[in-house]
Amino acid sequence: MAAVAMTPNPVQTLQEEAVCAICLDYFTDPVSIGCGHNFCRVCVTQLWGGEDEEDRDELDREEEEEEVGEEEEVEAVGAGGGWDTPMREEDYEGDMEEEAEEEEEVFWSSGIGGSNWDNMDYVWEEEEEEEEEELDYYLGDVADLRGEDEDEEEEVLEEDEEEELDPITQLPPPPAPRRCFTCPQCRKSFPRRSFRPNLQLANMVQVIRQMHPTPGRGSRVNEQGICPRHQEALKLFCEVDEEAICVVCRESRSHKQHSVVPLEEVVQEYKAKLQGHVEPLRKHLEAVQKMKAKEERRVTELKSQMKSELAAVASEFGRLTRFLAEEQAGLERRLREMHEAQLGRAGAAANRLEEQAAQLSRLLAEAQERSQQGGLRLLQDIKETFNRCEEIQLQPPEIWSPDPCQPHSHDFLTDAIVRKMSRMFCQAARVDLTLDPDTAHPALLLSPDRRGVRLAERRQEVPEHSKRFSADCCVLGAQGFRSGRHYWEVEVGGRRGWAVGAARESTHHKEKVGSGGSSVSSGDASSSRHHHRRRRLHLPQQLLLQREVWCVGTHGKRYQAQSSTEQTLLSPCEKPRRFGVYLDYEAGRLGFYNADTLAHVHTFSAAFLGERVFPFFRVLSKGTRIKLCP
């Protein structure tokens, strides 16, 4: 598997073969030199310090003309006796130095520089060594010949001072030093500059450009820290391309205009960034694990609750007839569906948290491992690691809690089924209620039998009473309960502004309504009705806090359940017109049901504290009426 993983990518290899070793970009007008390597025409021409092959014929002609001129000059010098004078070493050295300076000036003025020239130092060193050897050779010969000429001159002067030396014995002019042209890749040298166009390679490069507009970057970084292109140490980091480069790459066209920093600096910077992500990831993981444990406990509690309720349902239905067995099966089915839906939500939340925990664990381990690495291993895919660390977001599960009072709990099941069978609902627990006129707000009008209430046309003159509501259009039932189970039904008419429920005895009836609403203790009924139409859905908070009222009602088209500690928007499947209110004093439960379909609406868990609890009614708008069912 490791061998397969290290196999180079053919596409990447093809891209690399189409890149010039001098400019590190795709070939432009590629040419081949004598050793077979290919380069851009402009790059190799600048490297060799001359013009391209097209001007070679003209240069050859100029060289031939110069040779002819030199021969004529030699003949002229020989004829004039110039060679009779011994050559001085300093004269010859001066000529050689001038010639070397001219060649160097021409060479550097030809535009050599830019990318990858540092990698060509060996070319200049070899040429300088060859020139020095040739110069020493010629200077040595000149010195020897000069000595011989001096001896010969002395002998001739002794014989005949007027006799001239034979020009044939004079030193011939030194040949011009030859220049070598070296391949920048294989270092092979050539006596003449020669290259030819490579049309097939040019066509291939055009195809590669269409596939990949820019040369690949990934192959330059390896585990050994050596640039595979230039065999130089990777000591720099390009912040634009986000890759390690060598000093030769820094001078190339690809990176020359980019921001480059030392590799060690960026390694330390990225290490610090990774360390900065470790602690937040650890905290996220701990938070997810805590929520996961909490969800698992809730699932266990829900399962236990389901088992206990199913056992209670089975016990109640065991005493009923065949008809009750059918009802039992139907209710058990609905109950299981309800619990399975809750279990599904809880299980899904636990699974999501488990997935988040696993993901965070993997990412945390990766970040810790990467933060301990150094050099190039740390930088590989570092941006992707940062993105995944930064994109991690804690997704808490949906906040929900199982309703402790299910719509078909055992304390209501028997009475509901008996009522359905006999069209009566547990007469032992059913209450025949009436309204208490001493508690009614002056804007409320009670029916003669005290079973109905609505808004009056105008405010009524009623005697003062300590129990009377003076700040809100409410009325209580005449009967209160301190123990036992009790059930009553209420019929509501109109669609706006009503509430039914229960209130504890120790309520304050005279307080002004706080920020949640306004008082209606004065003014006529019309202004009261207009004011109540602008009220919020819920009961005023000051009223609820001091009265301990638990009620379900509407304002406009929306249903909601309201108490001093709870405010819940409701979405019943059907809009109930007849409510059943079920009070279990000892259990501290107050349940609301659709009396026509026995559908559960809402259940409060309340603390009655040994006080009497009275039925509670509220009317807010004209056209709304409440009637107690016998």
From Swiss-Prot:
Q: Where are the zinc fingers (RING-type)?
A: 20-61
Q: Where is this region: Disordered?
A: 51-97, 148-176, 503-535
* Superkingdom classification of source: Eukaryota
Gene3D superfamilies for this protein: 2.60.120.920, Classic Zinc Finger, Zinc/RING finger domain, C3HC4 (zinc finger)
Give GO MF terms, alphabetically: identical protein binding; ubiquitin protein ligase activity; zinc ion binding
The EC number on file is 2.3.2.27
Sorted alphabetically, the Gene Ontology cellular component annotations on this record are:
cytosol; fibrillar center; nucleoplasm
Q: Any phenotype upon disruption?
A: Deletion mutant impairs the production of inflammatory cytokines and type I interferons in macrophages after infection with both DNA and RNA viruses.
- GO BP terms, alphabetized: cellular response to lipopolysaccharide; cellular response to muramyl dipeptide; defense response to virus; positive regulation of type I interferon-mediated signaling pathway; protein monoubiquitination
Which keywords does the record carry?
Coiled coil, Cytoplasm, Isopeptide bond, Metal-binding, Nucleus, Phosphoprotein, Transferase, Ubl conjugation, Ubl conjugation pathway, Zinc, Zinc-finger
Query: Residue positions of the PTM Phosphoserine?
Result: S447
UniProt PTM comment: Auto-ubiquitinated.
Q: Report residues of the Glycyl lysine isopeptide (Lys-Gly) (interchain with G-Cter in SUMO2) crosslink.
A: K256
PANTHER family for this protein: E3 UBIQUITIN-PROTEIN LIGASE TRIM
Query: Which family is it part of?
Result: Belongs to the TRIM/RBCC family.
Q: What does this protein do?
A: E3 ligase that plays essential roles in innate antiviral response. Directly binds to influenza A virus or vesicular stomatitis virus nucleoproteins and targets them for ubiquitination and proteasomal degradation, thereby limiting viral infections. Activates the innate antiviral response by catalyzing monoubiquitination of CGAS, thereby activating CGAS. Also involved in innate antiviral response by mediating 'Lys-63'-linked polyubiquitylation of BCL10 which in turn hubs NEMO for activation of NF-kappa-B and IRF3 pathways.
Mind telling me what this protein is named? E3 ubiquitin-protein ligase TRIM41
